[in-house]
Amino acid sequence: MHDSFFDLIPSAPAEERVINEHPHLYPLPSRERRLRFNALPMKVIDAAILAIIMVAVVTSAVRAEKIRTAIPQANLNYLSIFVADAKGFFRDEGLENETVVISGPLSIAALLSGDIDYSGAGGSGMRAALKGAPVKGIMFQADKVTFYLVADPSVKTASDLKGKKIAIGSPGDTQDRVMTMFAERGGVSAKDIIRISMGSDTSTRVMAIKTGAANATTVDPGGLVFAQREGLHSLGFLGDLFPMPFQGFVTSEKKIRDNPGQIKRWLKGAIRGLMAVREKPEESVDLGIKKLQLGNATRAMIVEGTKNYLRAVSQPVPGLPSTEGIRNFLEYDIKIPMQIKEDIPPERLLYLQLVEEVKKEIEAGQRRTNR
């Protein structure tokens, strides 16, 4: 019984073992030794090569760490995670990732229980952190909100929103606040807007505009394509109002304390996924289209929506928000909705040192490649 595949190879004579152990004594292989090697049966050589390959594969599989990444929705905002899975970016980092769809609050509960490792419910996670939950934000996919404002023909500019009915998800949510800022920059007071809560379903709000129940609403990149095909027009990309990082990912403080190396490897895989979507949106859609839950959207619509989304992703290496962006995020996504007056130190909710390191490493690799 052989202990390993390598036992199939005949033992070398004593002379050969000495040569192998002390090659400096025999700087050039003798003709006899060459002939002796060449005389080995091909089956033996093939078995040895196969053994080496199998050992490498098994070793790689054993070393891969199993992790779970939760995203709140299987929409275009998280296409990059599916692309990172499909292209093996997490696997390249020694991680065997499983992507699951879990809504915000449930996702944070799963993170705290250890059932998942990373959560894309960044807003929910950081608001929970403010209440004492041991989680922190570790990256943001986008530097800006990804919303567009669409309207019926009666609304052509921000000033036209005065007295109009705006379909929103819920009062005070991120879309409501950003839409209000857009109106205020057009000289319209927040009090002059009529808000109608209709929930998060984009098609419901778009159809409300078509039936006259509302005049305008905010939509995500995929929703913009749907709205335009229904005859609505876009007043603009709300992400251009000001930098405010969006779609944050969080992990547990325990993970940060005990396994920062894994976090860096996960970040590298996730960021490479974002960069792949930006560089090849059509190919990325083809890779992720079976995972996305986008109803009856065609491939062309999804590609167009993906390009709309990419306006919010920073160049050249995404993931790390600007100082101004962090300040805006804390103000508009944390303090205002939670009615907090005192300042919030960023480090209370965020741990961005690791994504900063990963960003520098990727940039250094790009510079070496471009030389």
Enumerate the language-model features and the residues they cover:
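Secondary-structure end/capping motifs
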Residues: 258-342
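Bacterial N-terminal signal peptides
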Residues: 46-57
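Sec/Tat signal peptide C-region and signal peptidase I cleavage site
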Residues: 58-64
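A cross-taxon signal for low-complexity, glycine/charged-rich
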Residues: 1-2, 15-17, 23, 31-37, ...
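Pocket-lining segment of extracytoplasmic ligand-binding domains
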Residues: 123-124, 195, 203-296
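Short, glycine-/small- and polar/acidic-enriched structural segments
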Residues: 65-201, 205-211, 215-221, 234-238, ...
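Conserved C-terminal helix/tail region of periplasmic/extracytoplasmic solute-binding proteins
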Residues: 330-371
